[in-house]
Structures are given as C-alpha cells and as structure tokens.
C-alpha cells in the first residue's frame, strides 16, 4: 500500500477499473475505501505501514469485525493469492465490500 487513502477518488477509480475489467484492482480499491470509511468513523487508526491484521485487532464491535474479517479474507486471496476473478465473481464479492458504505 503506497497511497494515502484520504486522497483517492474511490468512486471514479473503481468505475474505471470495472470499465476496463480490472476486477482485481476494483476489489483492491473497494478494500481501501472501506479502510477510509472505518478511519473516518474513528473505528481504526489508519497508518500507511499497518497490516490488515492490525486493523482487525483494532475493531472492537463484532458487528463490524466479522464483515471486515470476511472482506480481508477476500482481499488477501484475490489480490495476493491470485484467486481468479471475473465479472460474475466480482458482482458477488462486491456486495460484501459495499456493506461498509452504510457504516
């Protein structure tokens, strides 16, 4: 993670990634967007050098921790585990990420 999540136009970048069928990048951006949402709500203390596990430990509310653990699992497997992702699987997985839009 090299970019400051507070300076990214997520909606535009996600739309561009989906339009170019770069679903792995779209998932990465959804994950970063969720980190920003959690940071903005003071549920995590975002720092560029923290790990996903660090954020999981910080989240105390189980109603947020459980879905965060799920998207972290998806993110890790899709972005680092080379889990194959096409438009159909993206459509299924994106619902898990969009839960945080309502936090």
Regions found by a protein language model. Give the residues of each.
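Membrane-proximal, non-transmembrane interaction modules
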Residues: 11-103
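Charged alpha-helical initiation segments
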Residues: 1-15
């Amino acid at each position: 993670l090299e970019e400051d999540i507070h300076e990214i136009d997520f909606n535009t970048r996600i739309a561009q990634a989906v339009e170019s069928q770069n679903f792995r990048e779209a998932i990465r951006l959804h994950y970063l967007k969720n980190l920003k949402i959690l940071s903005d709500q003071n549920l995590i203390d975002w720092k560029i050098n923290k790990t996903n596990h660090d954020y999981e430990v910080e989240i105390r509310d189980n109603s947020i921790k459980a879905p965060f653990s799920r998207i972290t699992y998806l993110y890790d497997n899709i972005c680092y585990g080379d889990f194959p992702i096409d438009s159909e699987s993206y459509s299924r997985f994106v619902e898990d990420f969009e839960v945080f839009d309502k936090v």
